[in-house]
Amino acid sequence: MMEVESSYSDFISCDRSGRRNAVPDIQGDSEAVSVRKLAGDMGELALEGAEGQAEVGTSDKEASSQPESSDGTTSS
């Protein structure tokens, strides 16, 4: 119970108020992460997503370009 009371008193004593600002300040590991590293990680995510979509799109086009015979199989 003491833990809640100390965080409550810390919040009350700071200049933040209102519902929007009801979250305490987060300053722990935020300084350890650089913007450059985050941008690099985001770039890798974007590239992996684009490559995956391109492969799916290509296989869909190949499947749709092969005509089906009357028995339901594709001709090669």
Curated annotation (Swiss-Prot):
Zinc-finger is among the record's keywords: no
The keyword Lipid metabolism is assigned to this record: no
InterPro entries: cAMP_dep_PKI
Biased composition (Polar residues): 1-10, 64-76
Coiled coil, from the record: none
Keywords: Protein kinase inhibitor
GO molecular function, one term: cAMP-dependent protein kinase inhibitor activity
The protein's role, per its UniProt record: Extremely potent competitive inhibitor of cAMP-dependent protein kinase activity, this protein interacts with the catalytic subunit of the enzyme after the cAMP-induced dissociation of its regulatory chains.
Full protein name: cAMP-dependent protein kinase inhibitor gamma
The species this protein was found in: Bos taurus
Annotated gene: PKIG
